[in-house]
Swiss-Prot record:
InterPro entries: FAD/NAD-bd_sf (IPR036188), Thi4_fam (IPR002922), Thi4_prok (IPR022828). Involved in the biosynthesis of the thiazole moiety of thiamine. Catalyzes the conversion of NAD and glycine to adenosine diphosphate 5-(2-hydroxyethyl)-4-methylthiazole-2-carboxylate (ADT), an adenylated thiazole intermediate, using free sulfide as a source of sulfur. The gene is thi4. NCBIfam families: sulfide-dependent adenosine diphosphate thiazole synthase. This is Thiamine thiazole synthase. It comes from Saccharolobus islandicus (strain Y.N.15.51 / Yellowstone #2) (Sulfolobus islandicus).
Length: 267
């Protein structure tokens, strides 16, 4: 097979990549919302926030997205979704197989790929290989005002390198079971009054409902979504059923959108 391929030398390759990357960072250094973690709740939140017209930046420490979706259930490649979360998956064109009324099985690879694509298509920016290791805070009034970020590879190499800062009107902790961002804020800014109760063992039926109900603001400018909610609020885990995860992402997006709208009205 003969193919005429455009010739691009190494200098152009490097220049174009550096230029476009720096333009993205320059644009998003001041964001409306920073989401930490590109798992199911983080991607769902990113999708709805970007759809609402908010400048939405997602940091993911790994080189892929999906969080716990990719591992499926003990590496089985299927997951469970229940009503009404199926409406979100249908919205992003994930195929569902109904196994009983209101209960669906989905393919893990399709689920995470289409949810991420939907968030990107809506306008969210996802940057891989970046770890959030601290927050920015302000006083009068006391609030979280952004994050400090570092390359994951730098942290893995145990190099002493200062981070850079990203400003945000709202920060969402979607880091999962450890609620990493909220944990740092609770430890380093005790004035925020955050108490982390710790996640409980499995009780799927209750966990799904309680996670969505308790999703939202934990301090001014700082929000919890997904499994971070269970860690902060002392709720049970639910295992490989993901309805609450995407519903939590949607719920936190709706709350942030309302909060930022109120803030704009006041100013």
């Amino acid at each position: 097979m003969e193919v005429k391929i455009k010739q691009v030398d190494e200098v152009k390759i490097s220049r174009y990549i550096i230029k476009e990357t720096m333009e993205d960072w320059y644009q998003f250094v001041e964001s409306d919302v920073v989401i930490v973690g590109a798992g199911p709740s983080g991607l769902s939140a990113a999708y709805y926030l970007a759809k609402a017209g908010l400048k939405t930046l997602v940091f993911e420490r790994r080189l892929s997205f999906g969080g716990g979706i990719g591992g499926g259930a003990m590496l089985f490649h299927k997951l469970i979704i229940e009503k009404p979360a199926d409406e979100i998956l249908r919205e992003v064109n994930v195929r569902l197989k109904e196994v009983e009324e209101g209960v669906y099985v989905v393919d893990s690879a399709e689920f995470m790929a289409k949810l991420a694509t939907a968030a990107i298509d809506a306008g969210a920016k996802i940057i891989h290989g970046v770890t959030v290791d601290d927050v920015i805070f302000r006083e009068n009034p006391l609030r979280v005002a952004g994050v400090a970020v570092e390359w994951t590879a730098t942290q893995m190499a145990s190099l002493h390198v200062d981070p850079i800062f990203i400003s945000a009107k709202a920060v969402v902790d979607a880091t999962g079971h450890d609620a990493e961002v909220i944990s740092v804020a609770a430890r380093k800014i005790p004035e925020l009054g955050i108490v982390i109760a710790g996640e409980k063992s499995a009780y799927s039926e209750r966990a799904e409902e309680l996670t969505v109900i308790n999703t939202g603001k934990v301090a001014e400018g700082l929000y919890a979504a997904g499994m971070a909610v269970t860690e902060v609020k002392g709720l049970p885990r639910m295992g490989p059923i993901f309805g609450a995860m995407v519903l939590s992402g949607k719920a936190v997006a709706e709350e942030i959108t309302k909060d930022l709208l109120k803030s704009e009205i006041r100013t």
